Amino acid sequence: MANLTTRKIVTFIPSGNQEGEFETAVQFYQEIGFTINAHTDEFAVFTKDESKFFLQKYPKEWIQGNLMMVLEVENLDDWWTMLTSLELERKYKGVKLTAPQIYPWGVREAHLVDVCGVFWHIS
């Protein structure tokens, strides 16, 4: 019998390839608590606990506003406190935060649009 067990799905996030976009994205993700596990001039691997994604210096226009990520956390209120204390909307162009609330699909979550235009559901 075939073993079709999956291990995980890992996403690539395009940072954009204009001057400074990749570096800004690297700084942003580190600021919100992700650790770099590998890094080149065009690629970075970020982890936090059991979560992982790849950041790639690649044009983002084709995906900007169309990519969503779900980050499930142990304590949403602690994450919200941390995110708001960082004043991300003031420091980074395009970043938007929406306070935690219960959505019609029954999940309490906060929303974050990051510097790459990725829409994060944090729950």
Where are these predicted regions, by residue range?
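Vicinal oxygen chelate
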Residues: 17, 69-119
